[in-house]
Amino acid sequence: LGEDFYRAGGVPAVVSQLLKNGLIRGDAMTANGRSIGDNCRGEKIQDEAVIRPFDKPLKAEAGFVVLGGNLFDQAIMKTSVISEEFRSRYLSNPDDPEAFEGRAVVFDGPEEYHRLIDDPALAIDEYTLLFMRGTGAIGYPGSAEVVNMRAPDYLIKRGIHALPCIGDGRQSGTSGTPSILNASPEAAVGGGLALLRSGDRVRIDLRLRRADVL
């Protein structure tokens, strides 16, 4: 699969499509001292069965949404893994469909999360939103896939396995947790997540594509 992607034009071909449609900054500098535009503008797709042109998508609505708000400028949510149980608990209020609010519990990195997630003193319940910050490309060198958070053990025993997870880092692509990831700007450079505190109320609205601390 990786070789097919490379032979079809690879990342430069994808970025060229984004540049052509105004979806990425062409003047952003890269590691080779040239801009993204200089590196990728004009690159061609060699195999449209592997890389589809922007105007010929395989699917008009993909399994992701881009959110913004006062917590971050942009972040990605993988909506294709939202289970019926999760949708029923969070997204089925007829007076406020596709939106939910909850109390934030904030972890400064995966080490703190692993140390504290099962601590009853955090008072995590089924409506809590779990946050992990300091895990972006600058705050956590290597940008490892560490924003994988489960519910505390006492909720799992009650059959509640997934809570909303939000972070400025990455997560394994095999994770089934409904998560908002790659929040930018990240906390390490002064993004909104740096100001968030446990106990703050946060609202997520998938219709408006917003994530805001209240």
Q: What are these model-predicted stretches?
A:
Residues 1-187, 191-214:
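Catalytic or ion-coupling anion/metal-binding cores of large enzyme and transporter domains
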